[in-house]
Amino acid sequence: MKIALATEVFPPKAGGAGWSTRALALALKGAGHEVTVITTAEGGNSEGPVPVVRLAGTSGPFRRGRMTGTFRRALNEVAAGADVIHAQHSLSALGALSLKKGPRTVVTVRDHWPVCFWSTRMSQGALCPQCSTANMWRCVDGRLPAFSTPLAVPYMKWDLRSKGQALARADAVIAVSEAIARELRTLAIGAVEVLPNIVDAVEVERIAASPATLSLPDRFVLFVGKLEANKGARDLVPAMAHAKTGLPLVVLGSGSEDMRLRAQATKEGIEVHSPGWADREDVLRAMKRAEALVFPSTWPEPLSRVLLEALALGTPIAAMDTGGTSELIEHDVSGLLATDVSDLGEALSRIVHDPSVRSRLKEGAASRARAFSPSALIPRYEAVYRGSK
């Protein structure tokens, strides 16, 4: 099949959604399909054997309309030659679904954009139960300039309504987890297929085994991600303090909570090594060496790429049980799940202090990762593309 993958985010500068799209592209190519990536992300014109068409991105006011138009025009050019257009994110999806005619159109939903204007389901630092009118007014408080606030809620309502209407036009909708699928099933969009992200354990092991470029402690607990409230940055040091591992915390990431974390660490006597954002290769090398990966996320995680790659490397994981995380990790088999900060600290303590726990989780993680391999998932993607699923 000739498959066009459309996405706003893609390597080399990308988070989990971009790298997951790359993994899908390479796996489809490896299965013999003709794959082209169309993206507004900056970078080169190929990703391994997969050609990449880079479009001019945009920011600022009216970004949604302009980006949707950019994708629509680009996809209209490839539509005649493609068997499938598979959109990977909100704006690429809106562009693909605005085509008047074309090939089969599939949309993957990787976060909460169809049900939450901000795509996070977080408001004022806490989980938002639903986008009711009252909750919307609370949500915009402090987020937008005062002069724009009266228009915000009507616009948010229109935005969510139009996204739902667009999704209903898709030939197939994929959710990356059952947690996301449950949200989508509250909308009138038809059937939703749950298809998780792909991880190629052979590739991540090869990268992780390459020579290190970061200078890291001999033994450490690792955090990877944005230092933001929804990622649990405020709970990192309290969890480490509760765990009493005696190990330093390595933070590969940055964000608005950076200074708070450093102050907490100083107060608690926790040694922190924070080189900031790291290339994916350095992240994988650090994962392979870490005594444990701590994952304190407080928002409803759709399906974390960090956790997927940690599983593939057999890294022992201590994670907060939010969103789709329990769909990746079976408690006490492929990782340890926690419900609060003290529980997370206890999980870290068990991993670091008990070699038998660490050994069991390493084996369970590597075994669990096989469920997300290209060989396990590509046939299911092909069935969706053919319309037989």
Language model features: what each stretch is:
Residues 262-281:
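Nucleotide-activated donor-binding/catalytic signature segment of Leloir-type glycosyltransferases, i.e.
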Residues 331-342, 350-356:
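Conserved acidic donor-binding segment of nucleotide-sugar-dependent glycosyltransferases
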Residues 129-172:
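Membrane-proximal helix-turn-helix segments that form the acceptor-binding/catalytic region
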Residues 357-371, 380-383:
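A short, well-ordered alpha-helix in the C-terminal region of glycosyltransferases
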Residues 87-92, 109:
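Short His-centered aromatic/hydrophobic patch
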Residues 316-319:
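Short hydrophobic beta-strand element within catalytic cores of glycosyltransferases
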Residues 19, 23, 219, 223-242, ...:
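A conserved mid-protein helix/loop that constitutes part of the nucleotide-sugar donor-binding site
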Residues 179, 198:
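Carbohydrate-associated surface elements
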